């Protein structure tokens, strides 16, 4: 458009030698302020503006006539004026001013072009390659750019904005007060016509924009106004009644040039800027003005033709390469502070609304698109690219847009979303499924099938779309369901090492398991555990491998070893680790009930496997069967046995990892009891009764008795569920050989049938027995804490029984100081129980009572000490560690009475106590020394003598234990170590140099380390007499000791000693001055 007019042609008759500064000075002269504008009357402001424009034009002409240095600039301006196709003078002073300003701007462009043409930069100096190259002469300084920007603002304000029709662009009155004054002083009736003025200004501005230095300054500030003018010039309808002014002024060629120029500048500028300006031109929904006072100030709505045009142009921007990013940036950039720059909450809400708006725009197929499928095929890869921006500041908003678009498209067009969004996102894992066909050329052993970047990006994208968005749309769930087994295998692999996608895999699995229907979730867990072989998994020829940047790659498997035992071991260990990881995963699924449902499923599966005997599984082949049939039969038997082992292994892991909170509602408890009863009935049918099965049956029936006994507030719906147990209870009561269980089953049937209105003593006794098998220190509130389905009101009501039964006894549910004699006796009896968990729990309860200074427990301190000492000899670590804790706490309360007994027990020989018991007493003494702290000085003599005697014990383990306790004691004594420091040092030197056992020598050197660490800077005072001997000992160990661990301890001790001596010889300077105030 600009190149077609004469304004773009370079002047030929005048030698352009005028300087750049002269042109800019002339422009400054036009912009110089005029007379006073202090009056507040509007008419006065108009007059001041017109007078200023006239005076500035007159001053410019006078400067041209009087100043000889400006003659060349005047000649250049006159030549450009002769070439121009528009009138420079008019009755409207605003247009005369605008015309002269445009001519000077063209002069500026010609001067810059000539400077560039004459510029000949010298060759760079090879000796100084780091020097900056010569600056182009058309580069404007900061002050020159400000002058040019001011001139542009006047040109746009006087020559473009006043001639835009209502609804096109931002009205001039709404911008500034000066804009309102300009709108009033412009005379639209004067020649040239308003449309011609707009065309001339837009053409000259586009001509100026062809110069690189000027174009960026023009479009960065005034692109919207120029685009609005071109839209009006090229697309405003011409058929009007009466005929409009556009039709009278512009030719069809000029309108075509305007359309072409609009598309050219839209392609030329920064695309987010183009999108933002087009949205501004398109305008928002019409908002009617109800206030009469403000009706004149309401902004006119954009015309229909302009809205359609902007919509079409925006769609073209969108469907260009990287068009999605341009649209998103155009809407979001510069709007981080919210709609009105308000508070953080308002800004966040505004961002969410904008993201939803962009998602709707992207998810809606434009009308000019050939088909919805072609549109989504083009933009969906760009939507996926929004997840992978590196700039953290903008990545959050872009990811939010991408996630919202993902969800919107998945709801409105699930087929296209699955084809163009989900499949490309999940492709790295889909091509490695067991059901996929991998080309043989790719299966080179060790070849990378999925790179670290691809797999990390896939997992991160799935996490953002599924977990962060948190919208369980059916197409999303269905697309991820076939890949769950691969995700679980990936999760198991990440547990073996450090990887940044470990937590992402776990969150994805937990999210999908919770959002799936319960049947599908259980089926997925079956696939995880290996019970369901039909679930797609990782291709058998593929494997995961750790990558270099903390990620994971998928490679083709290496050649398998011929060692069958090694292969079998790898297979078994892999299955075992996967089951362990499945248990860890289900730990997070207890509250939602999934863990309980899967546990019940495993119990039912076990019952079915017990019911199915080999003969019932498949008929035994006859002697005339073929070898193929025999092999098939043997394969089925092996698979059956393998499935049984898998179920048993899975149940063992679940029982080990799951807590008592696994069941969250009554239905799950009933299902658990039903599975147990069915298994018991199956065992009776095969005459396979066992002690373990009998105990399990008693426990499950006791659990029902607890529920019926009032620990849970049961509703009528709960009794409807409990009635499912009636047939099984009847079968147990008729066929089970144990009369006690028979009677309990019959009584439970009666209690369930009567909804708890009648209950026998057998039910109450079973409930009490079940509760007593729990930890006496716990509150029996499992069922009441896990689910809102189970009310807590039942704990406040008496049991609903016919003959009255005592409620559950909880040993420490009362506050400290309120323990009854009966409760104390029960815990003492539990401390002697043959069951390890019961005994250990009772010991810990007694220790807790001692720690809380319970009066009833402290009165029986001798009895408690006896119980703790007896349990020290127990072989189970849970029991003897609980006893050690109890003795240590008791010694803290009564050190004088108990410490003597402990020292005697520790100092006794092998004939009285086993070495293991003496080691446990040594652990107690170490804890007692730590607990006493500074009070240990009172018992210094007996402790040190006992430990020094222990160093001479024939048992090497006891010698090491004594040295460890001695080191702990020396750390606590500090200065009080002085009287015995020589004895201790001599002992350590002798042991470290002469003892035959390496563990004892290590312990001796470690005592020196503890001694130096405990004393720190006090070592030079406490150990002043023996410090040199200890140093010689440590050097001896470093040089001559064959054991590396002892050498390491000695080196650490030398480092401690070096630090102590440095601080002693060179104390840190304190920059302080002592000031004494005289009286």
Swiss-Prot record:
InterPro entries: ARM-like, ARM-type_fold, Rtp1_C1, Rtp1_C2, TANGO6/Rtp1
SUPFAM superfamilies recorded: ARM repeat
Main location: membrane
Top-level taxon of origin: Eukaryota
Keyword RNA-binding: no
Listed transmembrane segments: 473-493
Compartment list: Membrane
Family (UniProt): Belongs to the Tango6 family.
Protein name, UniProt field: Transport and Golgi organization protein 6 homolog
The species this protein was found in: Mus musculus (Mouse)
Recorded name of the encoding gene: Tango6
């Amino acid at each position: 458009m600009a190149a077609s007019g004469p304004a773009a042609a370079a002047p030929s008759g005048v030698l352009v030698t005028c300087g750049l500064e002269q042109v800019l000075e002339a422009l400054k002269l036009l912009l110089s302020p005029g007379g006073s504008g202090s009056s507040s009357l509007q008419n006065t402001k108009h007059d001041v503006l017109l007078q200023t424009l006239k005076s500035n034009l007159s001053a410019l002409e006078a400067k041209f006539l009087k100043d000889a240095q400006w003659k060349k600039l005047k000649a250049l301006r006159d030549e450009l004026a002769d070439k121009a196709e528009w009138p420079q003078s008019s009755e409207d002073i605003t247009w005369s001013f605008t015309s002269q300003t445009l001519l000077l701007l063209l002069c500026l462009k010609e001067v810059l072009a000539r400077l560039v043409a004459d510029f000949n930069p010298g060759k760079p100096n090879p000796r100084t390659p780091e020097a900056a190259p010569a600056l182009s002469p058309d580069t404007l300084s900061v002050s020159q750019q400000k002058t040019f920007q001011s001139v542009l603002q006047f040109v746009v304000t006087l020559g473009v904005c006043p001639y835009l029709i209502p609804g096109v662009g931002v009205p001039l009155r709404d911008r500034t007060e000066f804009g309102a004054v300009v709108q009033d002083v412009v005379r639209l009736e004067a020649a040239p016509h308003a449309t011609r003025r707009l065309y001339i200004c837009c053409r000259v501005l586009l001509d100026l924009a062809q110069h690189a230095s000027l174009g960026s300054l023009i479009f960065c500030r005034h692109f919207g106004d120029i685009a609005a003018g071109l839209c009006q010039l090229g697309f405003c309808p011409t058929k009007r009644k009466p005929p409009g002014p556009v039709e009278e002024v512009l030719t069809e060629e000029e309108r075509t040039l305007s359309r072409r120029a609009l598309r050219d500048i839209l392609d030329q500028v920064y695309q987010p800027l183009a999108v933002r300006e087009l949205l501004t031109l398109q305008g928002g929904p019409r908002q009617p003005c109800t206030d009469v006072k403000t009706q004149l100030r309401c902004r006119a709505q954009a015309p229909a033709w302009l809205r359609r045009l902007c919509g079409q142009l925006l769609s073209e921007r969108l469907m260009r390469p990287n068009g999605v990013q341009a649209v998103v940036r155009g809407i979001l950039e510069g709007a981080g502070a919210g709609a009105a720059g308000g508070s953080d909450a308002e800004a966040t809400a505004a961002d969410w609304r904008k993201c939803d708006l962009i998602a709707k725009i992207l998810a809606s197929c434009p009308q000019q698109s050939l088909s919805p499928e072609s549109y989504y095929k083009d933009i969906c890869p760009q939507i996926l690219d929004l997840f992978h921006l590196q700039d953290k500041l903008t990545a959050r908003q872009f990811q939010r847009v991408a996630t919202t678009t993902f969800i919107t498209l998945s709801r409105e067009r699930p087929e296209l979303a699955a084809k163009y969004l989900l499949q490309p996102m999940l492709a790295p894992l889909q091509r490695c499924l067991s059901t996929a066909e991998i080309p043989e050329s790719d299966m080179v052993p060790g070849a990378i099938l999925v790179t670290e970047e691809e797999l990390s990006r896939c997992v991160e994208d799935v996490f953002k779309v599924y977990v962060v968005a948190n919208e369980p749309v059916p197409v999303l769930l269905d697309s991820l369901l076939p890949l769950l087994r691969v995700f679980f295998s990936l999760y198991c692999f990440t547990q073996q090492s450090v990887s940044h996608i470990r937590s992402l895999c776990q969150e994805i699995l937990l999210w999908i398991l919770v959002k799936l229907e319960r049947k599908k979730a259980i089926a997925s867990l079956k696939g995880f555990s290996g019970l369901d072989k039909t679930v797609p998994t990782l291709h058998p020829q593929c494997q995961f491998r750790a990558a270099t940047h903390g990620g994971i790659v998928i490679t083709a498997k290496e050649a398998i070893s011929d060692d069958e035992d090694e292969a079998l071991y790898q297979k078994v260990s892999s299955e075992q680790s996967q089951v362990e990881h499945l248990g860890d995963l289900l730990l997070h699924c207890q509250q939602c009930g999934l863990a309980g449902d899967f546990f019940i499923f495993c119990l039912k599966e076990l019952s079915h496997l017990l019911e199915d005997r080999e003969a019932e599984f498949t008929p035994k082949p006859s002697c005339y069967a073929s070898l193929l049939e025999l092999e098939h039969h043997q394969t089925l038997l092996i698979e059956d046995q393998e499935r049984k082992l898998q179920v048993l292994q899975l149940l063992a892991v679940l029982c080990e990892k799951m807590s008592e909170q696994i069941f969250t509602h009554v239905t799950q408890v009933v299902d658990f009891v039903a599975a147990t009863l069915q298994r018991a009935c199956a065992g009776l049918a095969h005459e396979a009764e066992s002690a373990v099965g009998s105990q399990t049956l008693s426990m499950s029936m006791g659990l029902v008795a607890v529920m019926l006994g009032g620990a849970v507030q049961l509703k009528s719906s709960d009794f409807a569920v409990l009635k499912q147990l009636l047939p099984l209870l009847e079968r147990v009561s008729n066929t089970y050989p144990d009369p006690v269980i028979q009677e309990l089953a019959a009584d439970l049937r009666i209690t369930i049938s009567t909804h708890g209105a009648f209950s026998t003593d057998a039910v109450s006794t079973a409930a009490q027995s079940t509760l007593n098998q729990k930890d006496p220190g716990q509150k029996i509130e499992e069922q009441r804490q896990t689910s809102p389905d189970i009310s807590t009101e039942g704990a406040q009501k008496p049991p609903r029984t016919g003959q009255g039964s005592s409620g559950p006894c909880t040993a420490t549910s009362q506050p400290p100081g309120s323990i009854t004699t009966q409760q104390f006796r029960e815990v003492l009896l539990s401390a002697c129980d043959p069951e390890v968990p019961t005994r250990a729990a009772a010991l810990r309860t007694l220790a807790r009572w001692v720690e809380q200074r319970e009066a009833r427990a402290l009165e029986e301190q001798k009895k408690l000490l006896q119980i703790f000492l007896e349990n020290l000899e127990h072989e189970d670590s849970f029991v003897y560690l609980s006893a050690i804790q109890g003795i240590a706490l008791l010694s803290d309360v009564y050190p004088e009475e108990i410490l003597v007994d402990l020292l005697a027990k520790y100092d006794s020989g092998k004939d009285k106590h086993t070495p293991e018991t003496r080691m446990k007493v040594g652990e107690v003494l170490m804890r007692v020394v730590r607990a006493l702290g500074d009070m240990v000085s009172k018992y210094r003599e007996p402790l040190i003598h006992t430990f020094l005697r222990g160093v001479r014990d024939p048992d090497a383990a006891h010698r090491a234990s004594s040295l460890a306790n001695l080191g702990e004691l020396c750390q606590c004594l500090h200065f009080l170590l002085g009287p015995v420091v020589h004895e201790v040092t001599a002992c350590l030197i002798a042991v470290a140099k002469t003892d035959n056992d390496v563990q004892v020598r290590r312990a001796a050197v470690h005592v020196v380390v503890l001694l130096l660490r405990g004393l720190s800077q006090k070592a030079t005072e406490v150990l002043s007499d023996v410090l040199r001997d200890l140093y010689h000992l440590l050097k001896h160990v470093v040089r001559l000791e064959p054991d590396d661990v002892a050498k390491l301890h000695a080196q650490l001790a030398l480092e401690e000693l070096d630090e102590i001596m440095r601080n002693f010889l060179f104390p840190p300077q304190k920059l302080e001055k002592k000031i004494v105030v005289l009286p």
